[in-house]
Amino acid sequence: MNPLVYFRIFNNEDCPCGSGKKFKECCKGKTDQEPVQSKKPPEVQIMEQMRKSMVKCCMHPDQSNCNGKIKNAHALQNNKIISLLAGTERHVYTMDKKRQPLIIPIEGEEPEVMVEFSRVSANDATTETCFCDRHDNIAFAVIEKGAPDFDVNSEPMKFVYAYKAFIFEYYKQEVSHKIFQQCFKKRPPVFQLPQMVGLYRVSQLRLKEFKPVKRHFDSEIMAGTYNGIETCVITIPERINFANYTFIAPDYDLNGKG
């Protein structure tokens, strides 16, 4: 297939604005709603919109039993990993999505967008508004405050660590996709540029890959089981002052199979 087809919106596909209508019946041919053309690249506009519009919701599958406010849930455990990094001053350095991204001009190429690091309170590090108070306490209790250190033989621990890394990344992808839809609705001509359609295709693909994984996690959580997760533990023989979490789809598995 010609790869160029991924960089255009087709008449009969669902409109990227999220209306549910076909593109030709919705945003095709619409003009830009913004009165003044922004000098910022569209991808920077999306990042800025994300900083302002993080959705508050609970990602736990047991929606009927949500209780309490949507809280700033930590992707990395505040009372374990973050506390070790924060020390007595209770601060860490992290990529700051609340700050204005830097736009680095590169001669003859697209500008590079960079997110700066900032010193932030441990209470604010790696937080997202993606769990209600009840489910934040229940879903991650096995690895949170008062729980023993990580046990390589504990299936519940391995499952919950995998789930936590996944669900926070899934939440961010969903929010990013919704914000793209909002931006497309306001500025169809700008967000039909090839580089923006490319970002949209990547977002579509990620959600397509993520959704069956979420369905698996949801079904296991509701059943109270921990199946379907294979964990590879790599032990570093000394402590390092760095921590991260992510969910990715590698090109090859641990045995080199594609």
Predicted segments with their positions:
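A structural signal for the main folded, soluble domain(s) of proteins
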Residues: G29, Q33-K39, K71-N72, I143-K145, ...
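C-terminal, charged low-complexity interaction regions
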Residues: P194-G258
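Long, hydrophobic, well-ordered secondary-structure blocks that form the structural core
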Residues: F140-E209
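Extracellular repeat turn/loop positions enriched in glycine and acidic/polar residues, especially those
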Residues: G18-G20
